[in-house]
Structure formats: structure tokens, C-alpha cells
Amino acid sequence: MRTVAHDVSEQGPSAWQKFLADEPAFFLASEGLLVFPSGAAAKAGIPELVRKIKHIELTWGDDLRVDPLTAEFAVVGASYHEVRVDPKGDRLDEKGFFTGTAEYREGRWQFRNTHWSVIVPPAPTH
């Protein structure tokens, strides 16, 4: 998980390509929506993220959980903090919780599915 945060922060959104399984079984959901229904959809969508995000910083919280299911599969979860800056310089500061199923194949870990859950700020009181 440290490698994921490091590479995404250093290389930008394009780094996600090496961590997301490029296969039909892959999916990525965020806030209750299916963002990428397959590895091919993620691969096709990442270039758009590269255009929309000039800079990104991803850090995981100290609450990382890893539940090994087999020698090749594990479920992971952790809080996260992400700062994204768009090409105009507008900054988005986001916190939430990440979960995913990781698979070890071809000498490395990749996510077979992921879910991002964002902490929604409280509604203003009147």
C-alpha cells in the first residue's frame, strides 16, 4: 500500500494502471457508483484523469487492515487523505475510507476491485 501511495503521488493518476487488474473481473466503485466496470474501462478512463488532475498526493491512514484470504488474495482497507489539484490550480482535499481485493500474480499485487468512500462534510446549520 505504501508503494501505491508513493507511486500515485510521484507519477500522478497514470500510476494507477500498474495497480489495477487489466481484466474483465475488475471493477472500481466510488460513492455508490460503478466508475469503472472492468479493467478495460479503467485503462480507457485513466488518461482522462491525467488530463483533469495536475497533481495528486495520496496518503493512507495508520489503520491499514489486511485480511489474507489465500496466498494469492487479500482484502485490504484503510482510511486515506487525498489532495488533488486541477490544471487551473483549484485544490480538492478529500478524506475517506478505501477497500479493495488484491491479487498476487506475476510477481506483484494488483487490485481486482476497489471502493472509495468519501467523508461528507456536515450540512451547514441555519
Indicate where each model-derived feature is located.
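Second-shell loop/turn segments in exported
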Residues: R2-H6, S30-L33, K88
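A short, structured loop/turn motif at beta-sheet edges
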Residues: V66-V75, D90, A102-Q110
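A short hydrophobic beta-strand element
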Residues: L58, E72-E82
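Short, cysteine-centered beta-strand-loop-beta hairpins and adjacent loop/turn segments enriched
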Residues: K52, E82-L92
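A solvent-exposed, acidic/Ser-Thr-rich amphipathic alpha-helical stretch
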Residues: P13-L69, D93-E94
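Short, aromatic-enriched amphipathic alpha-helices that serve as compact interaction elements
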Residues: M1-A15
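Short beta-strand edge/turn micro-motifs at domain boundaries
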Residues: K95-P124
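A mature extracytoplasmic/lumenal domain signature
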Residues: L20, G32, A78-Y80, H115
